[in-house]
Amino acid sequence: MAGNRSNDIKVHCSFCGKSQDEVKKIIAGNNVFICNECVALSQEIIKEELAEEVLADLTEVPKPKELLEILNQYVIGQERAKRALSVAVYNHYKRISFTESRDDDDVDLQKSNILMIGPTGSGKTFLAQTLAKSLNVPFAIADATSLTEAGYVGEDVENILLKLIQAADYNVERAERGIIYVDEIDKIAKKGENVSITRDVSGEGVQQALLKIIEGTVASVPPQGGRKHPNQEMIQIDTKNILFIVGGAFDGIEEIVKQRLGEKIIGFGQNSRKIDDNASYMQEIIAEDIQKFGLIPEFIGRLPVVAALEQLNTEDLIRILTEPRNALVKQYQALLSYDGVELEFEKGALEAIAGRAIERKTGARGLRSIIEETMLDIMFEVPSQEEVIKVRITKEAVEGQSKPILEIA
């Protein structure tokens, strides 16, 4: 309620002491008054304190070995990729802390965004999520295939930033130190090395648009998403300290690597090194191969850290099912334990689940759906069968040849 200037008694701000005649407005509370100037000042103080809290958090970033230990609790395999990510993430946040306190003549540390290359279900998204969670920073996921360059029907790249701002509860200072994971980046590769003379709505044009926010810019983001409109209020966000991790399967890139290494299959009758079809060339990938695949040189240059993930084998998938803190087997065992029922997966069952995931080429992300198929009837029936004390999942149950074995009290 504003003070009434027609009254003889003047109202004064309880904080700065200014009268109602010296300020634009005074708000009355329970025996307390505050002027518009003190409201604005308090908002500025809160904003600065929030920013200081964000910076304070960054001074306690785990060391690379500590980050690796955290990743090992949740992510099986991919040792080289986990090491590369741990070092890159640590250096990124160390750079932010250094930049905030450096002198003008100090070394200017460049941002090291990350490119993850690996088959579907190898753990790219999960690695990025786990890192963000362990650092307690805002995290957003975007799909590159939904993006188009400005002026075309589709999603503007700025909407990626809106997702991060929303993940930070609209605290822009926190969002400016968050992590964004852009998936399916290989799907916006050019169709060839030569620049096309036609418009490339979802390829090179999107790479150019992403390039601007990845390398660092002050972007204007519509608060409600969608396209920008004249006279629309915008959120300003500086992307120079946002860590961008982009990932994709890059199907066929190993053939490009083989060609570069001189191991391309040569016609009949000619001498050539024999190719080991079971060998992986993922760790041999260099920038030249990625450019040949279809990413533009400027875009590759902003992704100096390349983490290659291998195809997960049967042993890896079994470990994923059983070892991590949030392993699927542990989750289902916990669910049935709430009904007083013990759940056991035989070794053959685990091998069958892993084998199905490999057959379907879904990797780790396909494990849950396979277990759901196997467990559906059990999860439906057992809670009503009080006499059941244990459920045993066999290989035959996974393959649909028989039902799981129930043990009765």
Swiss-Prot record:
Supply the gene name.
clpX
Sorted alphabetically, the Gene Ontology cellular component annotations on this record are:
HslUV protease complex
What NCBIfam families does this protein map onto? clpX, PRK05342.1
What InterPro entries does the database record attribute to this sequence? AAA+_ATPase, ATP-dep_Clp_protease_ClpX, ATPase_AAA_core, Clp_ATPase_C, Clp_protease_ATP-bd_su_ClpX, ClpX_bact, P-loop_NTPase, Znf_CppX_C4
Print the keywords alphabetically: ATP-binding, Chaperone, Metal-binding, Nucleotide-binding, Zinc
Domain of life, per lineage = Bacteria
Q: Which residues does the record give as Zn(2+) binding sites? A: C13, C16, C35, C38
Q: Which organism is it from?
A: Streptococcus equi subsp. zooepidemicus (strain H70)
Task: Supply the name of the protein.
Answer: ATP-dependent Clp protease ATP-binding subunit ClpX
The ClpX-type ZB domain extends over 1-54
